[in-house]
Amino acid sequence: MTNAESRTVLRILDANANRAGEGLRTLEESARFILNDLSLTERLKTHRHDLAVAMRRWNRFQLIGSRDTPGDVGTGVQTASEQSRADLSSVIAAATTRTQQALRCLEEYGKTADSEFAACIESIRYQCYATFRELELKMAGLNARSRKLVEARLYALIACEPNADYLKARIAELVDAGVDVIQLRDSSVDDRTLFEQAKLGAAIAAERDVLWIINDRADIAVASGADGVHVGQEELPVDAVREVVGPERLIGLSTHSIEQVRLATRTTANYIGCGPTFPGKTKSFDRYPGCEFLTQVSDAERSGELTLPAFAIGGIGLGNVEQVAQSGIGRVAVTGALAPHDGLHQTAMGMREILERVPLRITPDSSDVCPLPND
């Protein structure tokens, strides 16, 4: 190559080494702070380190000396999509694409002067393909659950069934009736039974495209492959539960006052249950915050103070769901009203019709991923 050609290659290598390093660091931050995934974070850091080692085969001062940012015509070429990112997944998608392309450029132009360098970059590139795949799939799973959650209207709580066939039938009738989220709640069975039904329910729910939540038991939620866990004010703190279930799964938290709602927004909870609204048959309480509490929650949503989906709970059925809707809440969690009976489908559809009159302020666009722990 001529001196001019060699200098051009150095410019290309310098630009793409910077681009690949920046992309890898962006992805490392996502694995570290969004997913809290130690393995992915370590692997991305290793890729970044391996790239730095490979670049040592080139004289750093020659690389820097070849750099001509003011004279680079490419710095002024931009597209509209480069200036915005729809959500965190789009940040990751852009970074993986940019990194892969930069590595390929390093490999191809490196072949003109150093075949061993090119081979090193090729190895890094293939390792990155595997890492990036895992990273994007984990982000996709996290986003899919969050999107389903914020679009949900009807949440049913059920107990364990006598056998697998009964559980399949129970889930099927709820899904067919328009239920979006199903929680398995049963303190009367042993752990093995709860786990087996939780695992079966998780598989069925995934097939039917509904969310499957386990009450109280974060360990069983993880072991069974459930979408999340719901805890009360007396159970493990939300941030401790997050340590168990990881960033991919949803966490719901029961709240009984506007003060507890405000505290919930400072945790990594994904949604809240608000109540009890009315007296019900499954649980008894000393006091019922009622629709006055729901109005406070709705006001908090309207003001932007609350950015978590809120489900009214407690004694709600077709006969009183209108009061919930008038409070400004368009999501409910139900037990008795959706217990097996001949009119279950009509009850669920009737409740849903009323709830859908209430606009959802917490939308997929405003809550694309689960809340993240503080850095």
Curated annotation (Swiss-Prot):
Binding of Mg(2+), residues: D216, E235
Gene3D superfamilies linked to this entry: Aldolase class I
Manner of cofactor binding, per the entry note: Binds 1 Mg(2+) ion per subunit.
Catalytic activity: 2-[(2R,5Z)-2-carboxy-4-methylthiazol-5(2H)-ylidene]ethyl phosphate + 4-amino-2-methyl-5-(diphosphooxymethyl)pyrimidine + 2 H(+) = thiamine phosphate + CO2 + diphosphate; 2-(2-carboxy-4-methylthiazol-5-yl)ethyl phosphate + 4-amino-2-methyl-5-(diphosphooxymethyl)pyrimidine + 2 H(+) = thiamine phosphate + CO2 + diphosphate; 4-methyl-5-(2-phosphooxyethyl)-thiazole + 4-amino-2-methyl-5-(diphosphooxymethyl)pyrimidine + H(+) = thiamine phosphate + diphosphate
UniProt-annotated binding residues for 4-amino-2-methyl-5-(diphosphooxymethyl)pyrimidine: Q183, L184, R185, N215, S254, K283
Pathway membership: Cofactor biosynthesis; thiamine diphosphate biosynthesis; thiamine phosphate from 4-amino-2-methyl-5-diphosphomethylpyrimidine and 4-methyl-5-(2-phosphoethyl)-thiazole: step 1/1
Residue numbers spanned by region Thiamine-phosphate synthase: 128-375
Primary enzyme class: transferase
EC number: 2.5.1.3
Superkingdom per UniProt: Bacteria
GO cellular component: cytoplasm
Annotated PANTHER family: THIAMINE-PHOSPHATE PYROPHOSPHORYLASE, THIAMINE-PHOSPHATE SYNTHASE
Function field: Condenses 4-methyl-5-(beta-hydroxyethyl)thiazole monophosphate (THZ-P) and 2-methyl-4-amino-5-hydroxymethyl pyrimidine pyrophosphate (HMP-PP) to form thiamine monophosphate (TMP).
Family statement drawn from the similarity comment of this UniProt entry: Belongs to the thiamine-phosphate synthase family.
Name listed for the protein in its UniProt record: Thiamine-phosphate synthase
Protein source organism: Rhodopirellula baltica (strain DSM 10527 / NCIMB 13988 / SH1)
